[in-house]
Amino acid sequence: MKVIEVSNLKKEFISKKRVVNANGKKSLFKTEKVVKTAVDNISFSVEEGEALAFIGPNGAGKSTTIKMLTGILYPTGGDVKVLGLNPSKDRIKLSYKIGSVFGQKEQLWVHLSAYENFKFFGSIYDIKKDELENRINELAGIFEIKEFIHQPVKSLSLGQRMKCEMVASLLHNPKMLFFDEPTIGLDPIAKETLRKLIKKINKELGTTIFFTSHDVGDIEEVCKRVIIINNGKIVLDDSMKNLKYHHLNKKIVEVNLKNKVDIKETEGIKIIKAKDTLYKIEVDMNKTSMDELMGLFKADDLQDITISSTPLEDIIKDIYRGKDE
């Protein structure tokens, strides 16, 4: 069953700017209309229980799309249905069926405890007292927050707060959760914990996940399908498996050695930068392995190493390059 159906969705923002006269100066009175197309006739659908990554660079149209899907913004054109409802016309009804977690926007009252927040949200969603207590207890166990559930939110670490944000969004048992940069600012351990929890609610509770993030690790770990949007248009809609093979197969390895060495490029190993004992290397995991790379160095010569995924912006460039070829 399709829980999201989007057809030719468009959003334009209209502003005004002062007209420049023949002498090169801006007029004090004359203005002209400026139309900025944030989302440009996109179409896609999402099946119930899917974990979808909706990603793109800053200003690509991600947040605008999410705001239209959740009823915050009215579309300029096109059709959108979420759980059979028109988000902009049926926003209140839809709010009982969806939840949202935003990494940079708190929904919890920081001076209250997490438990007090949950009671408050339960009353908003008209959840019966006994049912709410059972739900809080169940989710507190899943997310392992019982230890600090009665502490003021302002005293919690960012990782603990994000767990509580997720519990608050799940209290009314939504059919779908929207995540916008939920792991931003988290340390690696907290990120991994949150990723596992998102996968767990998708698998065990059957909650549909609509996920945006700039962290490639997030989407690799959580999602099975990816839509990439850029300049308001969808440039890719594919499985995570295919995206990994064609675009996430490259890793960036930065090493710091005790002594300068002569590293020779091989198939799958490309030197991006070499300065003194610092090396930045691109490794194509489809053609070689980390073991082969590490074989180029002596173990006791290695001082430091970091491994990262290809930046999202580079992935989008690769996609465009492939379309042009």
Question: Can you annotate each of these PLM segments?
Answer:
Residues 285-325:
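C-terminal coupling/interaction segments
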Residues 20-27, 119, 123, 130-148:
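Conserved ABC ATPase "signature" region
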Residues 173:
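Conserved catalytic motifs of ABC-family nucleotide-binding domains
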Residues 177-181:
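Catalytic Walker B motif of ABC-type/P-loop ATPase nucleotide-binding domains
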Residues 195-284:
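ABC transporter nucleotide-binding domain
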